[in-house]
Amino acid sequence: MNTLIKIRDLSVHYDSHRVLHDVDLDIYADDFLGVIGPNGGGKTSLVKAILGAVPHSGTIEFSPSLYDGTRRLIGYMPQQSNFDRAFPISVRETVVSGLQALRRMSGRYSREDYAAADRLLEQTGLQSIARAPIGEISGGQMQRTLLCRALIAEPRLLILDEPANFVDNRFEGELYELLKQLNERIAIVMVSHDLGTITSVVKNIVCVNGHVHRHESNVITAEQLDNYNCPLQIIAHGHVPHTVLEPHK
């Protein structure tokens, strides 16, 4: 298997509080990983450590295939709450800003950059609001905008933090179908609290609650969740079976 990222003995601390403990995890080129766990369990901290956004101990090794020159080919879609919607920028400009690191020397975007943004906006049904300020669009439209922004630099690994938040039911299905298509050529790591939906989309599950456990399947039993102290609810969505797991003591 082509390993994109090899994590060994990773720990993340905030002041004196250790959020992640001695994590070992491999991420492969064909992965579609669903990252689940309780609030405060370390899901977002794991993502931020991979992105180099938080101090940590241990090692994170990146495959040469994740680089184009010195540029690391990782796309990131943050939680919407981490994005300032009061900033005066349009949907289209937000998408093309995903190329900012590439265009830092010239300081400007090309016609081809905007054409790439327009293609993504059309693919996600946002072309009609391309020039709208982000402060005037819906939560679901903002999620799609951030997804386009994460994709515009053509990453080989896409990391998504709760991508279906605020998205309506119709586009949620389209979103997951798009991600499945993308996974034919890139690896995806998706953080989600909705176990009922995520298990129907991803290939493998990573359970995070201080420690990290990777399952080579998208099926998680109540017993496994209990063993890893991972108190989650499975919520019914359409034909998905309705199962409720009791909170752990």
Which residues make up each language-model segment?
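Conserved ABC ATPase "signature" region
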Residues: 111-129
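Catalytic Walker B motif of ABC-type/P-loop ATPase nucleotide-binding domains
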Residues: 158-162
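Conserved ABC transporter NBD signature motif
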Residues: 55-74
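Conserved structural motif at the start of ABC-family nucleotide-binding domains
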Residues: 5, 19-22
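Conserved ABC ATPase signature
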Residues: 133-137, 141
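ABC ATPase nucleotide-binding domains
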Residues: 219-249
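The feature captures the beta-strand-to-loop junction immediately N-terminal to the Walker
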Residues: 36-38
